[in-house]
């Protein structure tokens, strides 16, 4: 069984569940899970936990995510992307200045309250929002507080005078639960114009980037060397403060004992035999208690 994290560069047209299903067949392994759903039309970084690494999935969700994408002013849909029903169209007689676009983006940086698109996987009373939408049932969408760390215009926007549409490219870095589609829609509202997301690619998630990723096709063509594409579990904890345990302290840790450490970090990665075995969290006065045991007791 493989233990570690494989970063897939997801193609358009696939769900995150599709990727997990294909990996289970390719690797002949059931214990696999993804960390962070990507909509079918969105491409890019999809971290997949294998074997013992599935214990990390909740921690993986907590890390910031980064995206590059394109949006368009002059059109709005109910899904906030090109897959949905058109709700509003307005031909622009002249382009919006890039300065105005940047100023609107800056207003959306920080802690903001978002409402997910009606076509999304958020559950309300046990049912996903897109199911209500497909059945034509009105439902109140729950609001959520998210963090947007960066929202930048990455190139001069492009205005099409014949269509009265203006396209722009952007980069976003945000917390879990942030809908980039909603950010594009919110940008339009700040500008007083309909807006829609036209393209999105995730470039980073759970601490992994596109340069760490492999496509399913490339993996399938090189199955004899599948381990070459798998990141070790320890790679996820590269930015944690790490403590190497001696045999006596390891005996305590593997039995779940609290330990005393001369540290002030909130969480520490405890290593034994050059491998992270557990994550401990601070309880005050130098005491640390178990937060996550990564491997079975040895």
Swiss-Prot record:
Presence of keyword Transferase: no
Keywords: Isomerase, tRNA processing
Example GO BP: tRNA pseudouridine synthesis
Gene3D superfamilies reported in the protein's UniProt record: Pseudouridine synthase
Domain of life: Bacteria
Enzyme Commission number(s) from the entry: 5.4.99.25
Keyword Transferase: no
MF annotations from Gene Ontology: RNA binding; tRNA pseudouridine(55) synthase activity
Catalytic reaction list: uridine(55) in tRNA = pseudouridine(55) in tRNA
Catalytic residues, chain numbering: 39
Pfam families: TruB_C_2 (PF16198), TruB_N (PF01509)
Family to which this protein belongs: Belongs to the pseudouridine synthase TruB family. Type 1 subfamily.
Role played: Responsible for synthesis of pseudouridine from uracil-55 in the psi GC loop of transfer RNAs.
Protein name according to UniProt: tRNA pseudouridine synthase B
